[in-house]
Amino acid sequence: MDAISKTERRKQSLSVVLSTYGPGLLVTAAVAMAAQFLSEHYGAPAMLMALLLGIAFHFLAEEGRCVAGIELSAKLVLRIGVALLGMRISVDLLIGLGGGTILLLVSAIVATILFGLVAARLLGRGWRLALLTSGAVAICGASAAMAIAAVLPRNEFSERNLIFTVLSVTVLSTLAMIGYPIVAEYLGLDGQATGIFFGGTIHDVAQVVGAGFSVSPEAGETATLVKLIRVTMLAPVVLIFSLVLRSVPQEGASIGKRAPLVPGFVLAFLVLAGFNSAGLVPVLASEVGMAISRWALLAGIVAVGMKTSLRRVLEVGGDAVALVVAETLFIAVFILAGMYYLGHS
């Protein structure tokens, strides 16, 4: 009798969970699939489609049965997607690229973030937006923005700033995918140098691949490798941000429990990267993990879009646009200067 009552309680609990979160999760999944469909059939970036479609369904996040599930997608599902990116990372990537190029990439990331903080101050913008935009530009675009946003102290502008950052870096990545091959040809870069330029400067992975292989197989393969090295820096940078922000009293942050010393999704990213480096992750498992990561990130950005009013995004101002454009130009010039110093041409 007791066993039957336990079974009934489990069924009731499951029913409550499904009824609470199910509608919102299903809605974000459906919109994510629509975004992927549009991306595959019309060539638009999937992240951009997910974001715009999410904003169009903003009314679903205001009230009703979908609210809880949308909130879960915007937080837990999104962080699962970031954590699973670790399955793409291995020590072999670092070895295959060479010390000089790796040092250039690390220097570019640090310099871009510092430049973003200084530029934001000159433009009268806050440090939260500076860390968000410069981190996204320096590392891996929308994925980095979502990971960094998860450890920043929250205020009334948090979701607006995240949406703006994802939107701006995705648009700039698409423009770079079109324009940077012209720049590379004008500068007379060879296949490897072109790949380093694309992989070290374009924000999102998909656009890096598109730009690289539009030039040559060598440029595409090198660009992808270089970009994955930048993705490797995501966890260390987010961890450093988290540690620094914990040690500094924050003004204007919403009151709540303190963030953990090491965010769980960052720890999972590092563990998965370690397993992959040790050869403990089968190829099939890695492919499945990356597919789940891609869909989780799409669903997460759909949910973030749903939670944000387009009117509030438009309030961000021209100086914020100038900031992210300046950061994009800065990392491009920095990488090109470093390449010429190292003899890549």
From Swiss-Prot:
Can you say where in the cell this protein is located? Cell membrane
Please name the InterPro entries in this protein's record. Answer: UPF0324_pro (IPR018383)
Regarding the membrane, this protein is recorded as: Multi-pass membrane protein
Where are its TM segments located?
13-32, 42-61, 93-115, 130-152, 161-183, 193-215, 228-247, 262-284, 291-310, 320-342
Q: Which UniProt keywords apply?
A: Cell membrane, Membrane, Plasmid, Transmembrane, Transmembrane helix
Q: Main localisation, per the record?
A: membrane
- GO terms for CC? plasma membrane
Domain of life of the native organism:
Bacteria
* Similarity comment: family membership: Belongs to the UPF0324 family.
User: What is the name attached to this protein's record?
Assistant: UPF0324 membrane protein RB0971
Q: Source species, please? A: Rhizobium meliloti (strain 1021)
